[in-house]
C-alpha cells in the first residue's frame, strides 16, 4: 500500500486515514484491523480483501475531498472473525484506541497492540486444544528442525539426516506455521514441493544462531525466538530448549501414520486418536497426542504406564471421581504462560482459583503420593481478592472483593455517599418544589439531571438550569449537582486505577507460581491420560498386553472399525516370520493388517489393547505400504509411490520391525509385479522382520522359505453370491473371486458374464499351455543343446506359459 490509499478525490488523506496508513506501513505483511469506536475497520484494498474473505458488505469512508472503500467487523465478535481469517492464511495486526475518545486532544491515539499469526497465538479463544507449533527449518550439518509452542513455552528440536526424515517429523507435529531459512526460501523446487505436502503458512525471520549444538539446529532456534519476540512485542515465556532424538522412539514414518489413520482419516472422520481421546483436560489431550507421535522402545517405562492405567481399570469409582474433577480444570499449562507474559485476564485468575480448589479433592482421592505442588497460599489469596464472577477486562471494574484492600474500600464508600446524594436529592426536591413527578436521571451526554413533566413547568424553581427539552418534559441541573458529579467522576477514576493496581499485584503473585502451575499441569495431564485410556479399556473390552519375543494376539480387533460396524475378531501368532495373507478384495485383508499394527502401537504407548489376550515384541519401527498415500497430485504414479515406500522399508526395517505390505506390485504388469513381490518377500524373510504381506499373487504362497506362513481370509460362494466371513484362517486362499466381487460392486450382468467366459477360456488355455510346457521339458535332452539353443528353448517355454505366439519373447 505504501503511503497511498486506494480511493477517489483530489484532496489529501483525512487525519484518521493518515493514521491508518502510518500504522499499515509498519506491518506490510499483516492485515491491519483498525479500531474505530465499536468496530475494527479496514480501508482501501485491505477493505476489499476483508470483505471478500468474510463475505462482508463493502461500504465507503467519505470525507470532504476523499472517498475510499471500507469494511469492518464488530469488536464484540472479534474472536470468531479472527479465527476465520487466521485459518484463511492472514496475519493480523490489531490497532486499538489507547486513550478514551473524550480525553483525546484531537485524533484518538491508536497503537498496534497485537500481532496474530497461526503459529504464535496465546489467546485462549483463538487456540486449538492441540499443541500449536511454530516450526523453523535450516540446513547446514543436516536438517535443523525446531518447534516452539508460544502458548505453553514448549521449545524443542532435532537434527535430521534426510529430507524424508524431516517430512516425517513435520507430519508428526503438524505445525501451524513454518519459518524457512533463506537458502530454502530461495529454492523454488523445495518451496513448491513443501507447499504441496504441508498447506501451512510460510513466514520469514532472521536465522541468527542461538543456543548450543549443531549449526543448523542453532539457526532454527534463533529464528523461532526472533519471530516469536517480534509477534509478542518482545515478551516471551519459553522453557529451556530440549534436544530430542526421533531414534529414541518407535519409528513411525509418514506413510504409516497416514495408512493407520492415527491423526487424520483417509475416509470419513474416524481416527485412532479420536477413538482414544477420552481426556478431560486440554493438557491431557496434548499429552496423548505426544504419546502417539512418539511410542516408547523400553519395557520399563511402558510397564510403569500400564500399571497406572490398570489401577484406574480396576478401581472404577476412583476413575470416575478423578475424571469428574479433571473435567472442571482450566488449561493450567497455557494459563501459566499468560501469567508469565502478563496477559492473564480477571477471568483467567477466576479459572485458576476454580482449578486450585480441585487440587485438595484430587489429593484426597489419590493420596499425597500424587505429588501435586502446594498452591494453597495462592488459592487463599485469590479467594480473598477476586469476586465470584469477574469481568473479562480490568477496565470494566468490579473485580476486587470488598474487604480485601482498605484503600479501595475507602474510595468505594466515598463513591457510594456521592451516589446517595443524588438519591436523596430527588426526595428533597420533590418536597421543596411540590412537583410529584420530579425525578433524578442520568445519561452519558448530560450527566445527572432533574426531570420535570409539562404540567409542572410553572413550579420549576428559578435556580434550575435547563439542559434538554423533550416533547412532554424538560431536564435541568443545579450548580451543586455538577460539583457532586465531578467528584463522582474523580472517585470512579481513582477506583478504576486502584482496582487495576490491586489486580496487577494479584497477577504478579500468581505469576511467581507459574512453574509450580506447570508442574501441576504436567502431573494432572498424565493422570488424565491414564484415566482416559482406562475408560476406553473398560468401555470397549481391552486387555493389558504382555511383552515377549513372539507376537500372539487372541481375538484381536481393529479399534476404529469396531466402533462403526459389527466386527469379527481374529487370532495371529508369528515370530520373525513372513506371513502371506490371501483372499478376495473386500474380505478384510487390509483391516487385519492395520489392526495388528494398531494393537502394537497401542501397546507401545502404554495402553490396553483391543483383544482377549496379547503378547507382543517391542518393535523398533512400524512400516506400512497399504496404498493410502499415493501422490497423484504431486505428479507421482501409484507405482512410484509404492516403490518409494517399499524402498524405505528395505532401507530401515530390522528384525525388530513390524512390516505391513498390501498388494505390492499391482501398479505394473503382472509379470513385473510378481517378480517385485517375490524379491521383496525374500528380502524381508532374510531380514527376519515381522512381516504381514497381503497379496493377490498366489505364486508367492508356494515360495520355499522356511519362515513363511500362509493365512487367508475366508469367503464362500453361495446361492445369493459371495459371502465374506472376515475370518483369518490357516493356509492360502483357493481363488481370488475377482469376478464375483465385480458382480457385487454392480457391474452390468453382460460384462460379468463376459468376464466369466474369458476367465474360463484363459484358464483352459493356461492349463493346456502348462501341459505342453511339461511335455516338452520331459522330451528334452539338455546334454544335446547348445547354449544358444537352450536360450531359445527357454524363450519358447515362457511364451507358451503366457499364451503368447512363439518367437514373441526373443530379444
Curated annotation (Swiss-Prot):
Annotated function: This protein is involved in the repair of mismatches in DNA. It is possible that it carries out the mismatch recognition step. This protein has a weak ATPase activity.
Swiss-Prot/TrEMBL keywords: ATP-binding, DNA damage, DNA repair, DNA-binding, Nucleotide-binding
GO molecular function: ATP binding; ATP-dependent DNA damage sensor activity; damaged DNA binding; mismatched DNA binding
Protein's organism: Thermus thermophilus (strain ATCC BAA-163 / DSM 7039 / HB27)
Family, as annotated: Belongs to the DNA mismatch repair MutS family.
Name the record gives this protein: DNA mismatch repair protein MutS
Any single biological process term in GO: mismatch repair
Residues binding ATP: 583-590
Pfam families found in the cross-reference section: MutS_I, MutS_II, MutS_III, MutS_IV, MutS_V
